[in-house]
Amino acid sequence: MARELAAVYAQVFDLAAEVSLLGYCDPSSIDKRCVMANSNKVFKLCESLLPCLRLQNDTECSPLSLELQHLLQNTREALGVLTDLLSGDPSRSEYFEALHPSRPLEGPCKRHARVRVPFYGGAEKTVSLSLLNDVEVFFKRLNSVFYCLPAEGALEALGETVAFLGRLRGVSPIPPADAYVSSVPCASCFAEAAMLPNQGESVLSMLAAVNCNHVCRQVPSDPVIGVFENELRHLGADARAAGRAGGGRESERRGREDADDEEDDEEEPRDGQGDAGDGAALRVLTESSLSVLAGHTIFEEEDGRLAEISNLVYWSSAADRGGVGGTARATSSSHMAKLFAHEARMHRSRAWLGRGAPSHFFDAHRPSPLESLFCGGVFNSIDDTIAALQKDCSATFLKKSNYQTLIQQQNELYVRLNEVLNGAGRDEGGAKGAEAIADAEPLKPDGGASCDPRDVLSDARVRRDLYLKKLTRDGLRRLTDCIETHGRVLSDTLSLRVWGSALYASAARLVNHFLFRRQFVGLGWADLTAGGEAAFENSKYIKNALHGQRLNREHLDSIVVHFYRLITGPLSLQNSHFPVPDNVALAYCLDAAGAMPHQKLVITEMIWPGIESKDWIDCNFNSFYSIETGDLNLTQKKTLNYIREAVLSISLYNRVWEKSLSLLSATELRGSCLAESASGELGEGVYLTYEGTAPLVLVFDSKGYVFKDLYTLLYTHLQLSGRRQASV
């Protein structure tokens, strides 16, 4: 069945991606009949498939089934909106405004949600969701306190959260850029960190500079400069010719600019005539700036705006003094400016090739140069932008003529050595130079080395040149490393990302955990939660027998690890070839949820070496996992006490009566409880369901018994196991 589901998912995914593109196309270029036909097909598919998907997701879900349900719902809704819009023959502005409104719509915002989470004891928390990271963080926090809330309340909260995730999912394979942050580690990041040697670092410090690639997967992009030019050549056109053939003086001017840009790309010097317009604009800007600065003297307070204008005037004047003509123009040319000019030229070429061509969304709403730094362009990618920025940074730094001078001046050793060499070099054979050498003695020979001043000077000059080369080489290497590092940061931040699998995988595991708990409780076990006088006496008998016994200290470590495993959330339990220890899995579970040190201390102090039975046995009868009114911290403390009581009492019971009764958790069930129960795969033991109405289930000889009192359960197991031994 999974293969058929994957095949349907692939087809629906492709259709949803194409529907997402229709929202940015010229409405006059869209085939209305094709849209209506696809809309009818999707409506029929939803009528037949969506009820089955909902039924499956309410029994045992998977990441694929959850995302497919969202894609079907969103595609049906998007096609319905498109069909209604296209039926009215809207203009381009009306079409784009309806699909991409510039003003917020009335009514509740689909990009925000508030989810109420009920816990035992009447405590509840309200979680605000607005980003994909908020959903993922909520999953991690719920994973750390899964034993503090009932399955029904958890499924209701998870249902609202998954529905909010579906609204963010939309139909596009690209998530909204403002809907996620890549610097927040997800549960998969913590799982990967568990595989790495920490070298004494905490997992939080290891993930401090993480670039999460699981919630939204980064797509490696390649530079696209030159791809569209090749397409133009195949069509028998040239980008420059197309740009100049637009007609009119404006096209002629643009054609001249295009020719200038092309020659800039080839780095050919020009006579500077093409800079007349830019030079005039620069002079006007400089004159207006100087007029603003004219009234400022040293007696006035310094203004940040005036300081910025003064700096700009200073650096622009330094650039003017750098040279004239084509050489200065070539050296001051920016790779980013060439990129913007290339984008504009290709847009003009596209308009010239397809006269009367459709005007799409990016034609009516082009990004500004500053915005294009973050989103790229139609004819250049983010990688092209980052490469241009790197070239501009390195070129700007290397153009400074005083680069080596600054290095020399900052080095005290070189300054001293240079003074000695220059003083001696002016009068190398004279007494004055000899006295300077004798007074300074920068390099005093040892042993039988030559004492000729000429050799000393020659050696010093060689050392000076080598030292300068080393400084220059190291400086350039550090500059290159710095630019590459920041380039990677920009690439991680600005690169295109598509939907990852982490969110739906976490949602499926959490939903399945609470579904299995609800299914397990409702399997039709024999209900022995009513208690009674006989059950009270049986419970008292077991308690009295355990009170005089002590735990085996040799097995205390394994008992503690078992306790840790029972309170480790389903997202942190690993079923892989390289599982981490249970205590490490719990530590990562708490770190991922953002637990504070004092909260971890409460867990580590639950079991100590000298613990006795009176420290954990509850004197109340038939009240296991009964939480009174209190806040979440008190609820968590009480649930931990109940889980500790089950672990220690069953361990002591096995030691006293030489039994091998196992305490299992609902989190260890990897498949549907209904399927495992029907096939008889449920093993014997005590199952901790974390449900207040039926917390303990004893499975023995393929029969189940529900208890609210732990010691009545142990007495029942003692009787059933004794009958089995007697029959043998």
Swiss-Prot record:
Q: Which GO terms describe its cellular component?
A: host cell nucleus
Please provide the record's keywords in A-Z order: ATP-binding, Host nucleus, Late protein, Metal-binding, Nucleotide-binding, Viral genome packaging, Viral release from host cell, Zinc, Zinc-finger
GO annotation terms (biological process): viral DNA genome packaging
Q: Which residues form the signal peptide?
A: none
Q: Where in the cell is it found?
A: Host nucleus
Describe, by residue range, where the zinc fingers (C3H1-type) fall in the chain.
Answer: 186-214
Task: Work out whether the entry's keyword set contains Nucleotide-binding.
Answer: yes
Source species, domain of life? Viruses
Pfam families with a match to the protein in the record: PRTP (PF01366)
| Stretches with biased composition (Acidic residues) | 258-269
Give the Gene Ontology MF terms in alphabetical order: ATP binding; zinc ion binding
Tagged with keyword tRNA-binding: no
Q: Note down the stretches annotated as region Disordered.
A: 239-278
Q: Where is the composition biased (Basic and acidic residues)?
A: 247-257
**How does this protein assemble?**
Associates with TRM2 and TRM3 to form the tripartite terminase complex. Interacts with portal protein.
Q: Which family does it belong to?
A: Belongs to the herpesviridae TRM1 protein family.
Q: What does this protein do?
A: Component of the molecular motor that translocates viral genomic DNA in empty capsid during DNA packaging. Forms a tripartite terminase complex together with TRM2 and TRM3 in the host cytoplasm. Once the complex reaches the host nucleus, it interacts with the capsid portal vertex. This portal forms a ring in which genomic DNA is translocated into the capsid. TRM1 carries an endonuclease activity that plays an important role for the cleavage of concatemeric viral DNA into unit length genomes.
| UniProt name for this protein | Tripartite terminase subunit 1
Q: Which gene encodes it?
A: TRM1
